[in-house]
Design a protein with these regions (language model features):
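Juxtamembrane intracellular "pre-TM" segments in multi-pass secondary transporters
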Residues: 1-16, 192-221
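Helix-loop boundary and gating motifs at the non-cytosolic
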Residues: 15-62, 218, 222, 227-245, ...
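Interfacial helix-cap and linker-helix signal at transmembrane-aqueous boundaries
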Residues: 43-44, 75-76, 163-166, 241-242, ...
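Helix-to-loop junctions at the C-terminal end of transmembrane segments
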Residues: 68-80, 266-279, 363
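Structural signature of the two symmetry-related core transmembrane helices
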Residues: 83-97, 281-295
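Helix-loop junctions at membrane interfaces in 12-TM secondary transporters
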Residues: 100-111, 298-309
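Cytoplasmic helix-loop-helix junction between adjacent transmembrane helices
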Residues: 113-150
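Symmetry-related core transmembrane helices of the 12-TM Major Facilitator Superfamily/SLC fold
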Residues: 172-188, 372-387
Length: 393
């Protein structure tokens, strides 16, 4: 098994060189995600803001993701993707620096909104880069490798962010800005002058207009509901573990790191093991595990129970995420890739807008346990939507 996995990870074997280049870019960029992981704690613990205010501020970031996802898709149909990506990385460096310096709520809201726009656009553009620089047969493999790279970066970000936050929360912002600058330099060095592959219009069902593509619309609905449930991990889990499980900031950081490390270790072998299930059953089983992992949090105590919860919902994440993104790429091959990717990531980004508000209000009014019961219910609601989206998949 280990020998087979080693063969898969050879630079010029199963994955193309460009898949490795884009995965490395995503890894470096994800190191700056420590800001997202610890933003809720920073706003509440360092700045002393109410939990409801924290929810509204994080929703500003979510609103930016929503706008940026669609804007990035639209712009990528008119501006060279590499040039647009580099410009967004450059602006992001300064936004992250400013987030660590300002303390007024209106300025924080504006900067979080702008940061969300940038992150949403970059997320969409990364998918476009895979389509532009990878052959059709290699795109799903590039997706898998990018997912491992993303979580490897998140693991490092969670651990490093926890250590930096213990010393001074502002170091989290400055380190994130430095990592974003490094991502920009890597991107310019490896991709700027690389020729784009000629991508032809490919359509699996003859439909090239997203609003008329019914399976794609079901996918958008399932994506939005799943996203709202899953985003509570980023918007609420840190404060919940501090308030109800009494974990330290560093222990919370290690919890995020555990999630990412599990994905790194299990994603590729797990994806191969369930490959014959098809997209539908991978997503359905993953959703059930996600609901169980999040829904069990109110019924236990102690670090070991939290780790068990993390293990279960991480397995669910590892099962439903890859087919979700591969399905989006399949629909995007209809020739309107910018529109499809924009709408898909806009749907996912809606969770970052709605989830902090919903979870913040539930947390403040009914206590932290209600957040995870709501999340589990939403995941279960997504199951029939997923069933409709994956007819024939």
């Amino acid at each position: 098994m280990l020998k087979g996995l080693t063969q898969l990870l050879r630079p010029n074997g199963y994955f193309t060189p460009m898949a490795w280049v884009l995965a490395a870019l995503l890894f470096i960029n994800r190191l700056s995600a420590m800001v997202k992981l610890f933003m809720a704690l920073y706003l509440r613990q360092e700045l002393g803001l109410a939990i409801e205010t924290v929810g509204w501020l994080l929703s500003a970031y979510g609103a930016g993701l929503l706008v940026g996802s669609m804007l990035g898709g639209w712009l990528s149909d008119h501006v060279r993707t590499a040039r647009l990506t580099a410009a967004l990385f450059f602006v992001s460096v300064w936004v992250l620096m400013l987030l660590g310096l300002v303390t007024q709520v209106p300025w924080l809201a504006a900067l979080l909104l702008l940061s969300g726009v940038i992150d949403g656009a970059i997320r969409t553009l990364h998918q476009r880069l895979i389509m532009e620089y990878c052959e059709v047969a290699q795109r799903s493999r590039a997706q898998a490798l990018s997912r491992v790279a993303r979580n490897l970066g998140m693991a490092a970000a969670g651990v490093a962010g926890g250590v930096l936050a213990q010393a001074d929360f502002r170091w989290v912002f400055f380190a994130s800005a430095a990592m974003t600058m490094l991502a920009l330099l890597w991107f310019v060095r490896t991709t700027w002058r690389r020729p784009v592959l000629v991508v032809g219009d490919e359509s699996a069902d003859g439909s090239s207009v997203p609003p008329r593509d019914k399976p794609f619309l079901w996918l958008l609905a399932a994506t939005a509901v799943l996203g709202i449930a899953f985003d509570t991990v980023y918007s609420t889990l840190g404060n919940y573990l501090r308030d109800y499980y009494h974990l330290s900031t560093e222990a919370i950081g290690w919890q995020f790191g555990l999630n990412a490390l599990l994905v790194i270790a299990l994603q590729i072998p797990l994806s191969h093991a369930v490959e014959r299930w098809g997209s539908r059953w991978q997503m359905l089983v993953g959703s059930v595990l996600l609901a169980c992992g999040l829904g069990m949090l109110p019924f236990g105590s102690g670090l070991a129970f939290v780790c068990l919860s993390t293990l279960i919902w991480t397995l669910g994440e590892a099962l439903f995420m890859p087919p979700l993104n591969v399905l989006a790429m399949h629909f995007a091959q209809s020739g309107k890739s910018g529109q499809y990717f924009g709408l898909f990531f806009m749907s996912w980004s809606a969770s970052a807008l709605l989830s902090p508000v919903l979870s913040g209000q539930l947390y403040g009014q009914f206590g932290g346990h209600s957040v995870w019961l709501m999340s589990a219910l939403l995941v279960l609601i997504s199951i029939p939507l997923t069933w409709q989206a994956t007819r024939g998949a």
